[in-house]
Regions:
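Short coil/turn segments at secondary-structure boundaries
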Residues: 60-67, 167-169, 234-239, 293-301, ...
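Short, surface-exposed loop/turn microsegments at beta-strand edges and helix-strand junctions
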Residues: 64-72, 84-92, 103-106, 124-136, ...
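A short glycine-rich beta-alpha junction/loop motif
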Residues: 132-140, 170-193, 345, 359-366, ...
Length: 475
């Protein structure tokens, strides 16, 4: 029996808070039962008594997303992660579509939770003010009535909230968490003073994240200004006449999309850069050799879902080599830049930090480094509108549209002035510093909630205010 977890329960205990009559051992793990007792001892309210739970809505039949960013944001599950809901990359819908699902809008200070799929249990708090913004059916809105939304957010992010979600989800291929289960979450009762302190931490985290985004945007603007592309409007004519020698004879492409005039407009501007430009194949070193993971060695594995909007790696899965997917074949090093090759996620680019040195990434990324352009400037270049458009132009395929190796290596990059590169690097480092500080404050709020539940609120308040405690390892 050594190594096995055994728990004997009375029939009445099995049925307690078990309206779906689950009898699988997974549901009665020791950790789940212990945490339930801790919360019961502290005192709690069921969610249904202090919050309103509302589902999202899928697009109505016959409606689709717009092909531009001028519409109404539609928050997806992937937009709800890393603490704050971000609609920067959300698809948009028309006003007509919105009117069909207007009952499913998000509002300021809503706490959003994903309830379907592998991302189930991701939590985000809405800190933007938009008149209209819709929510996917794969998430729910939690509207607080009697508690602070920041406290609710931090509790759900804590091990107590996440373990409840893990315990109560059902299904394997496509796990789900029912709204009824969410309404039965036991939320610990804490003082208004403690909730206010959590609110202060989360608000400070949001402010730092906003400054991080502004600093990142400053780096983007600096580059585009320097390249003369800040307010550039490419040609938008629907027809572009080409001879055979200037079309298929040169590119091997017959699809009309490839020959849109806007691509030529961006290309000419880059080629006119006074300090010159060179194709990626001569500016960068491409790391495309396959690495075969060792079966019994543990690796960090980075995939598309781990790339943030500010060019950062937000996390990685940890697993033995024998369990990794066949696409986990690229080994990355500190300061490498990884660039997605798949259309629809071409903007998923990131710098590899020290934390992910020697990690593996998907073969869906190109891994590059350069002696002519620093990593921070490479990142901003690859995420800039001109290079994004040229990457999109190079994409081909039917089932999985992506840019192949030759097309990628032929894209020209401007040899950005060294002084501008230094300024961009400084801005990106500032942005990263602020983002890490923001993440640390959210972690502190989460740990404080755990400490308040496991020990007492006084210890948690001391921890928040910087007094020493042995109960939590947060720096």
């Amino acid at each position: 029996m050594e190594g096995l977890e055994v728990k004997v329960l009375n029939y009445s205990e099995v049925l307690e808070d078990n309206f779906t009559y689950r009898i699988d051992a997974e549901f009665f793990k020791k950790i789940y039962l212990e945490e339930e007792k801790i919360i019961a001892k502290l005192g709690f309210e069921e969610a249904k008594n202090i919050i309103v739970v509302k589902g999202g809505k899928r697009l109505p039949e016959g409606h689709d997303f717009l092909n531009n960013k001028s519409g109404i944001p539609y928050i997806r599950a992937e937009d709800i992660k890393n603490g704050f809901v971000d609609y920067t990359n959300s698809p948009t819908i028309s006003l007509l579509t919105h009117r069909e699902i207007k009952a499913y809008q998000t509002e300021y200070n809503d706490v959003l939770m994903t309830i379907v799929g592998n991302s189930i249990g991701d939590i985000g708090i809405v800190k933007f003010n938009l008149d209209i913004c819709n929510l996917t059916e794969n998430a729910v809105r939690l509207i607080t009535k009697k508690i602070n939304p920041e406290y609710l957010f931090s509790f759900l992010e804590s091990k107590f909230g996440q373990n409840y979600i893990e315990r109560n989800k059902v299904g394997t291929a496509q796990p789900k968490l029912s709204i009824e289960r969410i309404r039965k979450i036991k939320i610990p009762i804490v003082s208004s003073e403690f909730q206010d302190e959590i609110e202060s931490l989360v608000s400070s985290a949001f402010e730092k994240l906003q400054k991080s985004k502004e600093t990142y945007q400053a780096a983007q603007n600096l580059l585009l200004d320097h390249l003369g592309l800040k307010d550039f409007n490419p040609p938008a004519q629907a027809v572009n006449v080409k001879s055979f020698s200037d079309s298929f004879g040169r590119s091997g492409r017959l699809d009309a999309e490839f020959y849109q005039e806007k691509y030529e407009g961006y290309l000419k501007k880059i080629q006119a850069y006074p300090y010159g430009c060179e194709p990626i194949r001569t500016v960068c070193k491409l790391k495309d050799a396959n690495y075969t993971p060792k079966d019994n060695q543990t690796y960090q594995y980075i995939e598309l879902s781990n790339i943030g909007n500010l060019g950062e790696i937000t996390g990685a899965s940890l697993d033995l080599g024998c369990n990794l997917p066949s696409r986990a074949r690229r080994k990355v090093s500190k300061n490498d830049v990884i660039v997605s090759s798949v259309e629809g996620s071409l903007a998923s680019c990131a710098i590899v930090s020290e934390q992910y040195h020697q990690a593996l990434c998907s073969t869906g990324f190109y891994v590059v480094s350069s002696e002519k352009i620093n990593s921070e400037t490479l990142l901003i270049l690859f995420k800039s509108e001109p290079i994004q458009q040229l990457l999109k132009q190079g994409c081909s395929g039917t089932i999985l549209t992506a840019i192949n190796k030759d097309e990628f290596l032929n894209i020209p990059l401007p040899l950005v002035d060294a002084n501008i590169q230094t300024q961009i690097a400084d801005l990106i480092r500032q942005s990263n510093y602020l983002r890490i500080k923001s993440k640390g404050l959210l972690e502190k709020a989460k740990k404080a909630v755990e400490l308040a539940i496991e020990k007492d609120q006084e210890s948690a308040l001391d921890f928040i205010k910087g007094k020493q405690t042995n109960d939590c390892n947060v720096h």
